[in-house]
């Protein structure tokens, strides 16, 4: 139908050609020009292409056209009409309604006289009427005859446009009512009262006494059988110009007004009564057949057709009926999805019931007390509940208590008579764990003593006087050409500054990694173990040793007159009692000796604490096992039968 102007299809026949620069160029449109550099639209009948500017059709307008025919084709064949795409479901419903209307002899549609109020509400619509107003339909239809509507018909058309929200005055007793009665035919049709939701009307007691339809208002005889002519809504009266209603014409409902029903309504024969036209949710359609069955008493309290099981009928009892709640009407699409979900759930429930009957045939007669097994409770003769051995919880508790009183004393006596090897092994294991705990505590006390001794040595060393002698500086200038490589970065360094460089290089690389835990360390009696600095980004506490953490601690600035103070040793381990008295800045042999000694003591203390924690966990597990071994549940479930006490004693002769 429509195409890009750069690649049109040349028609096979019915076009002239002329030569330009020695080449044959096809010509198009009513202007007979070969121009293809603009928007073009093609006829779906003769396949001729036309420029949009020549026929006054833009590219945006063409997107809404489904089938387009040129003027010549429409003149030759009046049946050809331009068809448009429908963007909304209301437009589609309007098109179908227009296509089902009767036509006159010339093929044109018969249109009623447009109502000014309705046209004002519709505005610039997008339906078929708006398309005809723009001149996009076929111009060769016979002009319709002007139709004059009676005042009653004009009033009915206006009343049909009133929405459901406008059918309430808000002042009468029915409008102020907030609960459904649950007894009328409209309530029994609702889903919350177990109905099929076919009529979809408000409770009769909640129908407005001023603005609601007369057939929907409450009247005492609504629950009694009525004639079909009284219960069914009357069809719309035909217009004066129509002689007979066409078969395709749909009859609509009218709203019965006070005083106008008896004078203007003409009864139609049963043959002329057709199915009412389906309306939207706002019009609240009424199914005539179902409504007639309701009024005739077909849906009484004991004969509801949608009752598939006797278990689903207790809602009719006033004591068990739920209180009615005001339910808002939602859109049709949402209702359809809800109906699909309910139907799917009902099918699933039916299949599940069928499977349960095949898998558990004994449940089929669960309602029959004679088919149920007897309760196993002591002295109880009542039938057991389905899928249970007892008729109630009390019977089960009584039987369990009697079983404990009967079996437990004998099991306790057997437990006391025969020795338990696992119990003896547990006692020995507890003794060994306690010895290890005692040794760990002794080791911890020793490390605490060493910690305080080291602090005293460091304090005494700082009180020494600085002394610069040539003997201590001997060998510092030797081997200046010798180089070693750093273990962290691999760079060659001088042995004189090797310790200083390696310590700083290690701290730089170590600070790039974090070691943390979600909880701080709290150990009674322990001081200066972990760093425990909180990191708000990772929400963790640092778990490095406090004296070695390069991330959260820095070496203090050394003054010029501070002494080194490192204790001097002989043969590596033997202390001489003297201290290094070189200035701390110049001593390359004892770099950071205080930090390393403190870290050594703290690391040993941490190891002892870890050992104690492991021993506490082992003790807890052993005690839990020993407690559960002679408990009520273990004695009731397990039993050891000792047939020959002499040959089955697993203890060794030394243990006896």
Swiss-Prot record:
One of its GO terms (cellular component) is nucleus. The modification Phosphoserine is found at residues 6, 19, 124, 224. GO terms for biological process: positive regulation of DNA-templated transcription; regulation of DNA-templated transcription. Residues 1-14 have a biased composition (Acidic residues). It holds the Pfam family CpG_bind_C. Zn(2+) 1 binds at residues 169, 172, 175, 208. The modification N-acetylmethionine is found at residue 1. Component of the SET1 complex, at least composed of the catalytic subunit (SETD1A or SETD1B), WDR5, WDR82, RBBP5, ASH2L/ASH2, CXXC1/CFP1 HCFC1 and DPY30. Interacts with SETD1A. Interacts with ZNF335. Interacts with PRDM9; this interaction does not link PRDM9-activated recombination hotspot sites with DSB machinery and is not required for the hotspot recognition pathway. Interacts with histone H3K4me3. May be regulated by proteolysis. Transcriptional activator that exhibits a unique DNA binding specificity for CpG unmethylated motifs with a preference for CpGG. Its main location: nucleus. It comes from Homo sapiens. InterPro entries: CpG-bd_C (IPR022056), Spp1/CFP1 (IPR037869), Zinc_finger_PHD-type_CS (IPR019786), Znf_CXXC (IPR002857), Znf_FYVE_PHD (IPR011011), Znf_PHD (IPR001965), Znf_PHD-finger (IPR019787), Znf_RING/FYVE/PHD (IPR013083). A zinc finger (CXXC-type) spans 160-209. The acidic domain carries the potential to activate transcription. This is CXXC-type zinc finger protein 1. Residues 1-20, 84-162, 219-287, 311-373 are annotated as: Disordered.
